[in-house]
Every structure is written in structure tokens, then in C-alpha cells.
Amino acid sequence: GVFLDALKKFAKGGMNAVLNPK
């Protein structure tokens, strides 16, 4: 659903922030 997709997107963004800190 929309909520699950948003959650996945948030998790992916969080991982990117950890792996590639600006």
C-alpha cells in the first residue's frame, strides 16, 4: 500500500544517509 511504499522509501533514504553522509 501507499504507507508501506513510503516506509520503504524512508528506509532506503535512511540507509543512503548512513552510507553516503553529506
From Swiss-Prot:
Under the cellular component aspect of Gene Ontology, which terms does the record hold? extracellular region
User: Could you tell me in which tissues this protein is expressed?
Assistant: Expressed by the skin glands.
Q: Where in the cell is it found?
A: Secreted
Q: Which UniProt keywords apply?
A: Amphibian defense peptide, Antibiotic, Antimicrobial, Cytolysis, Fungicide, Hemolysis, Secreted
- Superkingdom assignment: Eukaryota
| Keyword Nucleotidyltransferase applies | no
Function noted in UniProt: Has very strong antimicrobial activity against Gram-positive bacterium S.aureus and yeast C.albicans, and very weak activity against Gram-negative bacterium E.coli. Has strong hemolytic activity against human red blood cells.
* UniProt-recorded name of the protein: Antimicrobial peptide 4
> Which organism's genome codes for this protein?
Xenopus tropicalis (Western clawed frog)
